[in-house]
């Protein structure tokens, strides 16, 4: 049996992690598209 606390932590961390990755990727894409000579 999976502990309810562990299950809650996983269910809470997964969306936050995906959201963080999406936001960082979006910021990098927007930054590179707005400033082509960023590198």
Swiss-Prot record:
* Cellular component per GO, a single term: plasma membrane-derived thylakoid membrane
| Keyword terms, alphabetized | Electron transport, Membrane, Photosynthesis, Thylakoid, Transmembrane, Transmembrane helix, Transport
Per the record, the major location class is membrane
What GO biological process terms are annotated to this protein in UniProt? Answer: cytochrome complex assembly; photosynthesis
The answer to whether the entry has keyword Thylakoid is yes
- Keyword Transferase applies: no
| Membrane-spanning segments | 5-25
**Superkingdom, taxonomy of origin:** Bacteria
Instruction: Name a GO molecular-function annotation.
Output: electron transporter, transferring electrons within cytochrome b6/f complex of photosystem II activity
Topological category with respect to the lipid bilayer? Single-pass membrane protein
A Pfam family this chain is assigned to? PetG
What stretch or stretches form a coiled coil here?
Answer: none
Subcellular localization, as worded in the UniProt entry: Cellular thylakoid membrane
What function is annotated for this protein?
Answer: Component of the cytochrome b6-f complex, which mediates electron transfer between photosystem II (PSII) and photosystem I (PSI), cyclic electron flow around PSI, and state transitions. PetG is required for either the stability or assembly of the cytochrome b6-f complex.
Q: How does it assemble?
A: The 4 large subunits of the cytochrome b6-f complex are cytochrome b6, subunit IV (17 kDa polypeptide, PetD), cytochrome f and the Rieske protein, while the 4 small subunits are PetG, PetL, PetM and PetN. The complex functions as a dimer.
Question: Which NCBIfam families did the record assign?
Answer: PRK00665.1 (NF001907)
The family classification in the record reads:
Belongs to the PetG family.
Q: What is this protein called?
A: Cytochrome b6-f complex subunit 5
To which species is this protein native? Prochlorococcus marinus (strain NATL1A)
């Amino acid at each position: 049996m999976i502990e309810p606390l562990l299950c809650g932590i996983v269910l809470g961390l997964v969306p936050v992690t995906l959201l963080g990755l999406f936001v960082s990727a979006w910021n990098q894409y927007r930054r590179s598209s707005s400033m082509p000579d960023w590198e």
